[in-house]
Curated annotation (Swiss-Prot):
GO terms (BP aspect): carbohydrate metabolic process; ERAD pathway; Golgi apparatus mannose trimming; protein N-linked glycosylation
Catalytic reaction equation(s): N(4)-(alpha-D-Man-(1->2)-alpha-D-Man-(1->2)-alpha-D-Man-(1->3)-[alpha-D-Man-(1->2)-alpha-D-Man-(1->3)-[alpha-D-Man-(1->2)-alpha-D-Man-(1->6)]-alpha-D-Man-(1->6)]-beta-D-Man-(1->4)-beta-D-GlcNAc-(1->4)-beta-D-GlcNAc)-L-asparaginyl-[protein] (N-glucan mannose isomer 9A1,2,3B1,2,3) + 4 H2O = N(4)-(alpha-D-Man-(1->3)-[alpha-D-Man-(1->3)-[alpha-D-Man-(1->6)]-alpha-D-Man-(1->6)]-beta-D-Man-(1->4)-beta-D-GlcNAc-(1->4)-beta-D-GlcNAc)-L-asparaginyl-[protein] (N-glucan mannose isomer 5A1,2) + 4 beta-D-mannose; N(4)-(alpha-D-Man-(1->2)-alpha-D-Man-(1->2)-alpha-D-Man-(1->3)-[alpha-D-Man-(1->3)-[alpha-D-Man-(1->2)-alpha-D-Man-(1->6)]-alpha-D-Man-(1->6)]-beta-D-Man-(1->4)-beta-D-GlcNAc-(1->4)-beta-D-GlcNAc)-L-asparaginyl-[protein] (N-glucan mannose isomer 8A1,2,3B1,3) + 3 H2O = N(4)-(alpha-D-Man-(1->3)-[alpha-D-Man-(1->3)-[alpha-D-Man-(1->6)]-alpha-D-Man-(1->6)]-beta-D-Man-(1->4)-beta-D-GlcNAc-(1->4)-beta-D-GlcNAc)-L-asparaginyl-[protein] (N-glucan mannose isomer 5A1,2) + 3 beta-D-mannose
Pathway terms, separated by semicolons: Protein modification; protein glycosylation
Phylogenetic lineage: Eukaryota, Metazoa, Chordata, Craniata, Vertebrata
Single Gene Ontology MF annotation: calcium ion binding
Cysteine pairs bridged by disulfides in the record: 453-485
Protein's name in the database: Mannosyl-oligosaccharide 1,2-alpha-mannosidase IC
Name of a matching Pfam family: Glyco_hydro_47
Family assignment from sequence similarity: Belongs to the glycosyl hydrolase 47 family.
């Protein structure tokens, strides 16, 4: 027993204690109890002691995990001040504010709670930006849509009366016919292929293809802005609902960087700028994040194919090459992704492309079509203003215009390239037709692709800002190239143009083999008609445009949509069973604009990406804030 071990203590009996000894024992015991319990209740609170009961904080990909404090109910996360890094959420908490109002976390990824497809809650690896969803509160970057719209110089849908000399009833009827064609194309797609990438009108089903990496609904997103500007309100709401409910980004295939950018991101960006609907902005930014791994190359020149599954840039071998028109047609969209997200990564990626191209030596001032993303050297000396090269030149002049005419680098690059093209590629046939040939190491192929027919409109668009002594020359050059492209249509049985046409052996502006005689609903010729019309108001461009409308109706319209044809030189051509998404995005849009007032999507306020999706010009105010950015 305890008392037996006290020195000098002799009990009177084996179990007895004298009264004074009992008193001393009780006094000692009470002091001991007081000391122990007093320390427990009276000592000041110590956060260090509290940490002894906490498991160490660990991080897992995409999450910040904190162990629960035993015996304590989780407290709600407090809203942090605007600038300092926010505190970690309370242990064990799944606070809706951590996913409804995500914030940047220095040194870590966002803590999110998925509310649907997994990709809606997870940023692309290595280039994450603050998540945002419809209805978000406290998002660190806000785009002021109303301020942006107030800076436009014309109403989006226009107000001015048509200034042509044609009877208004005739122009209105032509415009309504094109609107009906769009409505028919959309309704056919919705009935037989809704959610698929494109419609196959002969077999009345959908087609996915393999260049979108598993993404679906290319026709939906390509159609959004066309439906909006034609005021097909019910159809637009159908498309918008599909994007919000069914357009998912959790795909795992390999995708064309170029096609996803111009169709999906371009379509989503333009839909947002036209309507202010957050669903379009958010989807565009999230999809843009998924494209960023394509730029992880030794030079920063992106590879043409990106894997949505691994995030790799794909096929990264020393012998592979990137295509000029593909890596050169990202600038417009990526600047707007930065504009709408606040993430400078997008803009930095395309500025680096510009930097590489400025430094590299160019043969005779020309830009070959293939560049190694590994070495940064040209792979071949094949130069074309048609396929493989086309939209690179287009994006130079449009970058200048979209910047509010402040991007001097783009302007200089464009006019330098145009001078080289004139010097080495421009030709006039014996029959007087002006065309742009293809250049292969100094040897010319005297052919012009349908894709190159956009160049008439491009040159017209850039004529105003050329040196004064060159402006009239460029206007005339634009008109002559556009006339040549019209001839390629006029010289076919269907009055539709072939995929490519030649100038040799006494034959001009015609295809020389069946493999180049097809027409797949391409827009480039009517695109140039639209630009030339807006610049000159020469009625010939509306006449030529109406010829295309009639030919489309006669040879391409089927029971269930529009189809390309296999031979433009046959009066009874076979169909290719494909309604291209760009037919709704571009061909019908440009035709509609051709027969509309000039301030419907005024060129003072908008530039069109190479898929005809309108993106706004930067009308900066004196404070330097552009496009409503805060």
């Amino acid at each position: 027993m305890l008392m037996r071990k006290v020195p000098g203590f002799v009990p009177a009996s084996p179990w007895g204690l004298r009264l004074p000894q009992k008193f001393l024992f009780l006094l000692f015991l009470s002091g001991l109890v007081t000391l122990c319990f007093g320390a427990l209740f009276l000592l000041p609170h110590s956060s260090r002691l509290k940490r002894l009961f906490l498991a160490p904080r660990t991080q897992q990909p995409g999450l910040e995990v904190v162990a629960e404090i035993a015996g304590h109910a989780p407290a709600r996360e407090q809203e942090p001040p605007p600038n300092p890094a926010p505190a970690a959420p309370a242990p064990g908490e799944d606070d809706p504010s951590s996913w409804a109002s995500p914030r940047r976390r220095k040194g870590g990824l966002r803590r999110t709670r998925p509310t649907g497809p997994r990709e809606e809650a997870t940023a692309a690896r290595g280039n994450s930006i603050p998540a945002s969803r419809p209805g978000d509160e406290g998002v660190p970057f806000r785009f002021d849509f109303n301020a942006f719209r107030s800076r436009l110089r014309h109403p989006v849908l226009g107000t001015r009366a048509d200034e042509s000399q044609e009877p208004q009833s005739q122009v209105r009827a032509q415009r309504e016919k094109i609107k009906e064609m769009m409505q028919f194309a959309w309704q056919s797609y919705k009935r037989y292929a809704m959610g698929k990438n494109e419609l196959r009108p002969l077999t009345k089903d959908g087609y996915e293809g393999n260049m979108f990496g598993g993404l679906s609904g290319a026709t939906v997103i390509d159609s959004l802005d066309t439906l909006y500007l034609m005021e097909l309100k019910e159809e637009f709401q159908e498309a918008k609902a599909w994007v919000g409910e069914s357009f998912h980004l959790n795909v795992s295939g390999e995708a064309s960087l170029f096609e996803v950018n111009i169709r999906y991101i371009g379509g989503l960006l333009s839909a947002f700028y036209l309507t202010g609907e957050e669903v379009f902005r958010i989807k565009a930014i999230r999809l843009g994040e998924k494209l960023l791994p394509a730029f992880n190359t030794p030079t920063g020149i992106p590879k043409g194919v990106v894997s949505f599954k691994s995030g790799n840039w794909g096929w990264a071998t020393a012998g592979s090459s990137s295509i000029l028109a593909e890596f050169g047609s990202l600038h417009l969209e990526f600047l707007h992704l930065t504009e709408l997200s606040g993430n400078q990564v997008f803009a930095e990626k395309v500025r680096n492309i510009r930097k590489v191209l400025r430094k590299i030596e160019k043969p005779f001032g020309l830009y070959p079509n293939f560049l190694s993303p590994v070495s940064g050297n040209w792979v071949q000396h094949h130069v074309s203003v048609g396929g493989l090269g086309d939209s690179f030149y287009e994006y130079l002049i449009k970058s200048w215009l979209m910047s509010g005419k402040t991007d001097m680098e783009a302007k200089n690059m464009y006019y330098e390239a145009l001078e080289a093209i004139e010097t080495y590629l421009l030709n006039v046939s014996p029959g007087g037709l002006t065309y742009i040939a293809e250049w292969r190491g100094g040897i010319l192929d005297h052919k012009m692709g349908h894709l190159a027919c956009f160049s008439g409109g491009m040159i017209a668009l850039g004529a105003e800002d050329a040196k004064e002594e060159k402006r009239a020359h460029y206007r005339e050059l634009a008109a002559q190239i556009t006339k040549t492209c019209h001839e390629s249509y006029a010289r076919s049985d269907t009055k539709l143009g072939p995929e490519a046409f030649w100038f040799n052996s006494g034959r001009e502006a015609v295809a020389t083999q069946l493999s180049e005689s097809y027409y797949i609903l391409r827009p480039e010729v009517v695109e140039s008609y639209m630009y030339l019309w807006r610049q000159t108001h020469n009625p010939i461009y509306r006449e030529w445009g109406w010829e295309v409308v009639l030919a489309l109706e006669k040879y391409c319209r089927t029971e269930a949509g529009f189809s390309g044809i296999q031979d433009v030189y046959s009066s009874t051509p076979n169909h290719d069973n494909k309604q291209q998404s760009f037919f709704l995005a571009e061909t019908l849009k440009y035709l509609y604009l051709l027969f509309s007032e000039d301030d419907l999507l005024s060129l003072e306020d908008w530039v069109f990406n190479t898929e005809a999706h309108p993106l706004p010009v930067n009308h900066s105010d004196s404070s330097g804030r552009a496009w409503g950015r805060h």
